[in-house]
Amino acid sequence: MAGFPLGGGSHSRDNPAPPVPPVHPADAASFLYATRGGSFQLWQQQEQQPFYASNIIRFADDAPPAPSLAGASSSSSSRGMRSSGGGGGGGGGGISCQDCGNQAKKDCTHMRCRTCCKSRGFACATHVKSTWVPAAKRRERQQQLAALAASAAATAGGAGPSRDPTKRPRARPSATTPTTSSGDQQMVTVAERFPREVSSEAVFRCVRLGPVDQAEAEVAYQTAVSIGGHVFKGILHDVGPEALAVAGGGGASEYHFRLTGDGSSPSTAAAGEAGSGGGGNIIVSSAVVMDPYPTPGPYGAFPAGTPFFHGHPRP
């Protein structure tokens, strides 16, 4: 082995050996060192590990350091773990804005947030106009809607009090009082249509009441008048002599045919008027006279089917 003294210590002191050229660590992996006792010792050279810290930020423009052969596997594995962890974090947090660093919109092709995208003037369809309305404008809008609802309710309900259109109106039972008809009300209704007492001029026809084969039948007078569009007809029965009627509290004037109506009549004076001596105020009214005889006359205006009694006695 050239370059190493193999002799004793005296020989080395008297004849010094020539200097040994330096050996590069890559050319020799081990060195032999001589001790003072003359023996040799083999020493393995330790490789220098590159200094690397996982928490140091490395920029994209910087070139990565060249790892040694021994630490290539460990650095590559650490980088793989770091890249996988970073990929998981990137998937959860999304992409960052290229200008401000805030979170960018996922579908934005410019990889920027809404503020930076709008400030740069990019025509991005992802960043639409915000629909958020300030509280002051929302309050003003609510007041306008309430005023419109109140005006609509006032227009629909007339002068009634305004109410909230969202509330349901309260159902109020109708306070109706049932009306009952009494005799007094009916009398008032009849009195409004016809006068209470009227003396009328009419024609009376003498008729016989009783069986046909009876010689002495009851004599009565029959008449009919039309007052106010209504036909009134009836038969006046014999109640006895006038003296008895006066003694009983009545007179001939009490048996006048009192009807309701007005107007004039072409008929003759009644038999009761002749008996009473023409006393009392007589109200002339239009009268429809019933003719009991089969001979047609100017006053035969009664409908067919009315029972008539002829005044001719049987032979």
Swiss-Prot record:
GO MF annotation: an example: sequence-specific DNA binding
Entry protein name: Protein SHORT INTERNODES 1
Motif placement: Required for homo- and heterodimerization: 227-230
Source species: Oryza sativa subsp. japonica
Result of knocking out the encoding gene: Significant reduced tiller number, enhanced culm strength, increased panicle branch numbers and reduced grain size.
Binding locations of Zn(2+) 2: C97, C113, C117, C124
Residue ranges of the TM segments: none
Comp. bias intervals (Low complexity): 70-82, 143-156, 172-182
Tissue and organ expression note: Predominantly expressed in axillary buds and young panicles.
Pfam families assigned to the protein according to its UniProt record, in alphabetical order: DUF702 (PF05142)
